[in-house]
Each structure stands twice: as structure tokens, then as C-alpha cells.
Amino acid sequence: MKSNLYNRWFSVLLVCLLIFVVSGCSKDEGGTQVSPDEILGVKGDLTVQFSARFGTEPFAAAKGYAYQGKQKVMFSKVEFYITDIQLVGTNRAASDQAGLINLTGSTEASKNISLTGLASGHYTGIEFTLGVTPALNKKSPRDFPPSNPLSLSGGFWEDWGSYIFTQILGLVDPEGSGHFTNGFAIQTGTDECSVKVTIEKDITIKESKPASITLDVDVLQFFKQGNTYYDLIADPLS
């Protein structure tokens, strides 16, 4: 693991790739906006779905993508924690649920987080921490039940006393020959690397109709540095 400043830089880059295209069903059929005050005490659910691509191509694990020059790249893991999720507007609806989003997962459930028990009403956006909040990061996997993604020991650095906020692992084919021989591993963690993300979006939570939004993630943009891309051959570890 490199310096906190270096990892903070990667965390900010990850937020840049999470310049989401937001879509989905979040209003009632008539388009009526309902405030939390109008349905006081009623709860509803929201599914946040993450849809990944690599440039213009659909994203998947173990698939080769053109990178820079002759190089090709494939990924075995792209995952990140999100915590402190809140719907924002005139009022707020907070969730204490944590999510571990695995864009290379084999199931749709690994790319989603389902939030339950949210106060019904109309909201104008969603906020979350990309990573693990300092309060939660003081804890360790043994402090959480098995159903909580923060219970996973593979997502925690014992020596650093921190969760691994993001992990991007894969292989590079240096010559575009079909031989993926060079590995790389990018990981971020520690309190300085958690980043707050705010996305504007009309969201209506109703008891009778679970809502959903989709966040579009371009993984290629994570590696972009000006007019070129991060050198995964010269600097494969972070």
C-alpha cells in the first residue's frame, strides 16, 4: 500500500468515474411528488443498482479490453464499499446499511444494494460515502454479523487497522498478443481516502411500490490521466 496522499488521489479518481448516469423508476405513475410530511411514519424500499461499462463496451470480468497503445487489460475484481447512504431533500432519510459493490460479480445482487425502511416521500438526490466512514472504520469485521458486508475479513487490513475501500485487480497484455502476463492491484483505504458522493435525482419512496435507480459507471475513466492513461506496467501496485 502506498502513501495516504497517493491513495486519496485514487479515491478521488474513482469518484470521477462515478459521474453517474442515473435512471430508473422513482416516481409514482401519475408523477405526483409526495413529501415525507404527507406520509409520516410510512416506510418504503429503494434498490440502488450499479451498471458498469468500459468505454462503450459492457463491462465483465475476465474479458480483454483495448487499453493504451497495443495493450489490453482484463479485470478479476472491481469492488468498493459504500456507507452512510442518505436520501436528501427538504427532509432526509438515512440508512445504516453498508454495501460492497462488486462490478465483476457473477450475479446482479453483487452489483446492487437494497435499502429498506426508508421514510416515504419525495427526495431530490442521494448521498453516500465511497469507502467506509471513520466511525465504522474504527471497527473490524468481528464487530459485525455475517450478513453485513463489513464482516468480511478479506476486505480489511489488519496491519493498518482499516477497511479496504476499493479494490481493482487484473492483468495486462503488454503487446496485445493475447497473453495477459502482467498483474496489477490498486487498493485504497484509511480515513483520508473516504470520499462523499452526492447525486441529484428525483426519488419517491412509497410503501406500496419499491423504487430503484441505476448508476452508470465507466471503469475506463478511472485510469485516465489527461490525454493518456495510468501506466499499469510501470506502476502496477497501489
What are these regions (language model features)?
Residues 21-24:
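C-terminal motif of bacterial Sec signal peptides marking the signal peptidase cleavage site
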Residues 26-238:
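A short, solvent-exposed, low-complexity linear motif enriched for acidic/polar residues
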Residues 14-19:
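Hydrophobic helical h-region of N-terminal Sec-dependent signal peptides
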